């Protein structure tokens, strides 16, 4: 390690080039400031395509250039931006080409308020994405509240300022303090419980208030638990945390944000002068509306009066109308009577045409005609049937077995009356009957002889 970069330099006898000077200076800076921690605020942030990050780190009185090369920049989890307070670690070096000295960084982290600001922005984005800041969730403040709950510290100027405003502007309003810590480790839990208790009391409105302080002092109002407790309140709530320039997460979630606790009280405590002015305005509006209404009613009455006619004229018109209706009624009756007479005449004509006497005469004539035709038809029918019967009898005689028997043939019958068709159906000694054309004979079989029979050819 070079203990004294200038120990061999004789300024009276040796002249250095610019490059030599910058090189000696770089070695000196890197040797003495090999690793340092520096805290400041980012400005002039640049991100070229190479992946390196360049910015200026500054405080109120001075600034220094910083370089965060790609391999180290990849390890930084925070979103870098101008104005972010950070704490960096690195070595002091010198860029020989320009003679600028700079910090070559190997670590970067949020510093102080910078870390809190990152947490603030992260929670703000989360709750905004859930819709907790949307206007649709905001409740309107009551115009004339009677009971107001105040969630704040029981000591300090805040509660005194709020009470003073109400005494001056609206002494009739009942104020109730729900005490809570507004700073420190226990503040978050106490504020949440105080809000829940106040919301259950049925107040017309709530005030969540605290005086000014640093970001760390006001941090409990940026906790997610407090923000969700404010959002859960059914009672309209005004949030007044810190000074006018201080903005908390609770301010975004509340129904109304007031820049100061006194301003919150004034929002809920309209002054007597304001009320009197509003009353005067309402009175003037009422008088104007009454005058306008009376004027319109008077004009309407005049119009009705002009349209109103004398009763005698109305009676005369009604009498004329009655006469007209009477004439119309008489004409209608005459038309109805004539129409009825014409219809009656048509019905009489139809009735005469359909008289039963005429129908009976026609039926009687038809009966006489049919009576004269009946004997002839019966004789013709009987004659035809007789001829048909004779033809059938002749046909029957031709095919009758009796005709065959009359020609010398006979039929043998057994004791059951069944015809014997073959000699094989008989037995010697069997008694049979022989039916002839004119009678029957009892015969006995002496013997049966089967003989072949030659059938005639067709």
Curated annotation (Swiss-Prot):
Its EC number is 3.1.11.6. GO terms for biological process: DNA catabolic process. GO terms for cellular component: cytoplasm; exodeoxyribonuclease VII complex. Pfam families: Exonuc_VII_L, tRNA_anti_2. One of its GO terms (molecular function) is nucleic acid binding. It catalyses: Exonucleolytic cleavage in either 5'- to 3'- or 3'- to 5'-direction to yield nucleoside 5'-phosphates. Bidirectionally degrades single-stranded DNA into large acid-insoluble oligonucleotides, which are then degraded further into small acid-soluble oligonucleotides. This is Exodeoxyribonuclease 7 large subunit. The lineage of its organism: Bacteria, Pseudomonadati, Pseudomonadota, Gammaproteobacteria, Pseudomonadales.
